[in-house]
From Swiss-Prot:
Signal peptide bounds: none
Name of this protein: Endoribonuclease YbeY
Pfam families found in the cross-reference section: YbeY
Predominant location category: cytoplasm
Species of provenance: Caulobacter vibrioides (strain NA1000 / CB15N) (Caulobacter crescentus)
The protein's Enzyme Commission number: 3.1.-.-
Entry's Gene Ontology cellular component terms: cytoplasm
Enzyme class: hydrolase
Entry cofactors: Zn(2+)
Length: 157
């Protein structure tokens, strides 16, 4: 089944900072989908927006009144329906990339892969879940020539 990836750019800061942001998002999402052949659903919507919009979504749906890098909203399982929606906050993502000393393009692809995995049911609440999800992220990102996003985290552990 072909799954569509619709990308909506609400904050032009994304394309100002990263001219090929839409292509990067599509490649990262598609890499996750390609690694999962048994997906049921028609599509994913990915919104590239600003911190205020993500803060409002986080407050309204998660009761957490702050902006975060990425939010994933899985849809109820339905082979004929959407898999879910993802929203990414430009300011938070750009700040994190700068603080971590990595290109915004790499951080964006990581967060898209992370968000799509959440839509597919992956989580990181428990250590074993986090390890499995991070391993899958590393594998997918390696295929996109994105360095291990957790390398510096592990050095500090």
């Amino acid at each position: 089944m072909t799954i569509t990836v619709d990308i909506e750019i609400e904050d032009e800061a994304w394309t100002t900072a990263e001219a090929d942001a839409e292509a990067l998002v599509w490649r990262a999402a598609q890499a996750v989908l390609d690694a999962h052949e048994d997906i049921e659903g028609q599509g994913i919507v990915i919104l590239l927006t600003d911190d205020d919009s993500v803060q409002a979504l986080n407050r309204d749906f998660r009761k957490k009144d702050y902006a975060t890098n990425v939010l994933s909203f899985p849809s109820p399982p339905n082979p004929e329906g959407q898999i879910g929606d993802i929203a990414l906050a430009y300011g938070v993502c750009a700040r994190e990339a700068a603080e971590q000393g990595k290109p915004l393009a790499h951080h964006l692809q990581h967060l898209v892969a992370h968000g799509v995995l959440h839509l597919l049911g992956y989580d990181h609440e428990r250590d074993d879940e986090a390890e499995a999800m991070e391993a899958l992220e590393r594998e997918i990102l390696a295929g996109l020539d994105v360095p291990d996003p957790y390398a510096s985290d592990e050095e500090g552990r």
